[in-house]
Regions:
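Short, polar/acidic, helix-capping and beta-turn segments at strand->helix junctions
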Residues: 2-145
Length: 145
């Protein structure tokens, strides 16, 4: 995540629409409490203007909300929701570290790991659960790699 700029989501004519925090409110999205680490690592480390987050799980507190594999115990819809919850957790950690999501310029990279069974090939549809949330909050022009 890149930090240190007050960039805002812009309309087609270049006028500001909303900051990330305003977009969350407009969308009716309440971030969860930041998850508790499962180990002795830091969930957020900032160096210069870059903020690195540990891999986020689809948890509430220390409770896993989605357990299983795509194509076995979980379907695409459940996995899509799991990716969204993990992204919400990441935003909660970023807000806790920075004080406001408005400090983020953009999300540079998004990694989504999906446990699957058999020859399932729908991982991109699962990752869209996180990507769609980030696009809603930061705008299409700020999609991560």
């Amino acid at each position: 995540m890149n930090t240190g700029s007050k960039d805002k989501i812009l309309s087609g004519d270049g006028s500001p629409l909303a900051t990330a925090e305003q977009r969350l409110r407009q969308l009716g999205i309440k971030l969860p409490a930041p998850p508790e680490p499962f180990g002795i690592y830091s969930e957020a480390v900032q160096t210069g203007k870059l903020l690195f987050l540990t891999g986020m799980l689809p948890t509430v507190g220390r409770e896993a909300k989605f357990i299983g594999r795509l194509g076995a115990e979980l379907d695409i819809e459940a996995c899509h929701k799991a990716a969204r919850l993990a992204a919400l957790n990441a935003l909660a950690v970023a807000r806790q570290h920075l004080g406001s999501l408005d400090e983020l310029t953009r999300i540079v990279r998004l990694g989504v790991a999906v446990a699957t069974s058999g020859d399932v090939r729908d991982q991109p549809k699962v990752a869209d659960g996180a990507s769609e949330l980030l696009q809603d909050v930061f705008g299409k022009d700020k999609n991560p790699s």
